[in-house]
């Protein structure tokens, strides 16, 4: 969405759950902006295609995959996420869906669950999996509440300061070390 803001010069698209913690409110806000400015799904897909991975992200993900099953729990939408997932080597992505009109406008969004990230963690745990979670925003707090261990990665100071009980890292190496430290399989 920040790339949509950059492409369209409409700064309001740069708001994230860091700014509007309730994801439903944020998406309602974004859809109203899209309608107001006549933007379509293709505008968002084009922005998604322009995104580059953060430096070191793919190397980190590949190293972590050597020891862990990796699932991306995201508040994005399948209709938007494909370019980024391709760059990440298509990890398992659990996210939401959009309703698209015949003219390509985004009519609505469909959340899989109000607290989809938390529900996914609980589902994996119900099958006997131990879950370590990492995120950078308010919408990740729901999964930290139930994960066996949660970590902030590159979170804004405001969020990590508000939640000092959650370890915060600014490097993938430190996060990888924390994952390994909390693993039951790696010694």
What are these regions (language model features)?
Residues 79-131:
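Substrate-recognition "cap/lid" segment bordering the active-site pocket of phosphatases
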Residues 94, 166-175:
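Short acidic-hydrophobic, aromatic-tinged amphipathic segments that line or gate anion-handling sites
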Residues 78-82, 140-141, 176:
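Short, well-ordered alpha-helical microsegments
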Residues 62, 122, 141-142:
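Alpha-helical segments flanking ligand/cofactor-binding loops in enzyme cores
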């Amino acid at each position: 969405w920040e790339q949509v803001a950059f492409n369209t010069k409409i700064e309001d698209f740069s708001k994230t759950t860091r700014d509007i913690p309730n994801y439903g409110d944020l998406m309602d806000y974004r859809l109203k902006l899209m309608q107001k400015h006549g933007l379509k799904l293709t505008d968002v897909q084009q922005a998604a295609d322009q995104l580059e991975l953060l430096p070191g992200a793919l190397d980190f993900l590949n190293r972590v995959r050597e020891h862990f099953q990796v699932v991306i729990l995201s508040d994005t939408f399948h209709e938007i996420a494909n370019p980024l997932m391709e760059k990440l080597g298509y990890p398992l992505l659990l996210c939401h869906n959009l309703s698209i009109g015949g003219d390509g406008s985004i009519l609505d969004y469909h959340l899989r669950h109000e607290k989809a990230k938390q529900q996914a963690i609980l589902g994996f745990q119900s099958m006997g999996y131990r879950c370590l979670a990492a995120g950078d925003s308010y919408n990740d707090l729901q999964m930290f509440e139930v994960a066996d261990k949660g970590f902030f990665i590159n979170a804004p100071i405001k969020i990590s300061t508000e939640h000092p009980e959650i370890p915060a890292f600014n490097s993938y190496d430190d996060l990888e070390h924390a994952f390994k430290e909390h693993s039951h399989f790696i010694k």
